[in-house]
UniProtKB/Swiss-Prot annotation:
This is 6,7-dimethyl-8-ribityllumazine synthase. It is an enzyme of class 2 (transferase). It comes from Deinococcus geothermalis (strain DSM 11300 / CIP 105573 / AG-3a). CDD domains: Lumazine_synthase-I. GO terms for molecular function: 6,7-dimethyl-8-ribityllumazine synthase activity.
Length: 154
């Protein structure tokens, strides 16, 4: 049996990051982690474009448009949705997740769901690099690997 995996080399890749302005103190850390992961794996910062949207609800549409341009090998969506006292959290997080997945499937371009969905601000900060790694970096690494795997399949 042949085992085929993507490698973590971003030297010739061009990525778009789409991040939310909402919860920017958390999201800014995710963006920093994403950029660092891209560069540490051979990517050039000039091959990384950063787009900012108001909130997580806007991520899927902008990600899809970016994917459709053909300029990007992958799109990394970053945000933070923190549970509050109403059901708003469920609709925003669920809508963003399904919209991002549908955008990737529709365009054939890998699009990462790097949106934190947490109960508290503390949990979100931990996942943005304080204690539990940086989920922005993890989303970027997943896209580097996925793009390189897809190149082997074509």
């Amino acid at each position: 049996m042949n085992r085929i995996e993507g490698h973590l080399l971003a030297a010739d890749l061009r990525f778009a990051i789409v991040s939310t302005r909402w919860n920017h103190l958390i999201v800014d850390r995710l963006v920093e982690g994403a950029e660092l992961a891209f560069v540490q794996h051979g990517g050039k910062s000039e091959n990384l474009d950063h787009f900012i949207v108001p909130g997580s609800h806007e991520l899927p549409l902008v990600a899809r448009r970016l994917a459709e341009t053909g300029k990007y090998d992958a799109v990394v969506c970053l945000g933070a949705v923190i549970r509050g006292d109403t059901d708003h959290y469920k609709f925003v997080a669920g809508g963003a997740a399904s919209g991002i997945l549908n955008s990737a499937l529709h365009t054939g371009v890998p699009i990462a769901f790097g949106v934190l969905t947490t109960e508290t601000v503390e949990q979100a900060l931990n996942r943005a690099g304080i204690k539990a790694g940086n989920k922005g970096a993890e989303a970027t690494l997943a896209m580097i690997e996925t793009v390189n795997l897809l190149r082997q399949i074509r």
